[in-house]
């Protein structure tokens, strides 16, 4: 299944990993940053440089760990991309994340495991 493939790719990216996939392949990834927000900014910059943003269609975003704040989700919303978000939970702010996801009608899928690579 593609979800298993996406998770396996994510496991090999440095901590604070964000990976963006289309239906069949990795289209952008970033890790080793001080935050997942910075990793997402790098991913989006790479997409824009490749000029894929407008032709990419639906994307799947995978995070190696939970989102401690809504900042990453707010950036996704501001980019107006069709993105399904896959991430584990476990932050003390999970209730804020869940509230934001519900209010903004995100397709948010909870993963059972974290995949840090230090």
At which residue positions do the language-model features occur?
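Short, basic/aromatic recognition patches
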Residues: 1-17
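Alpha-helical scaffold segments in soluble metabolic enzymes
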Residues: 5-8, 42, 46, 75, ...
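Solvent-exposed alpha-helices and their adjacent loops that cap or buttress functional pockets
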Residues: 10-13, 51-55, 77-78, 116
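Structural beta-strand/beta-sheet cores of well-ordered domains, especially the beta-sheet scaffolds
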Residues: 16-17, 59, 104
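C-terminal binding/interaction regions
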Residues: 74-118
């Amino acid at each position: 299944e593609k979800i298993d493939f996406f998770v396996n790719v994510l496991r090999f990216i440095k901590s604070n990993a964000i990976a963006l996939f289309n239906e069949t392949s990795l289209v952008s990834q970033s890790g080793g940053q001080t935050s997942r927000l910075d990793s997402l900014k790098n991913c989006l910059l790479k997409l824009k440089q490749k000029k894929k943003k407008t032709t990419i269609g639906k994307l799947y975003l995978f995070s190696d760990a939970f989102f401690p704040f809504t900042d990453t989700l707010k950036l996704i919303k501001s980019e107006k991309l069709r993105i399904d978000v896959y991430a584990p939970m476990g932050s003390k702010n999970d209730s804020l994340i869940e509230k934001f996801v519900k209010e903004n009608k995100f397709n948010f899928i909870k993963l059972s495991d974290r995949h840090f690579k230090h």
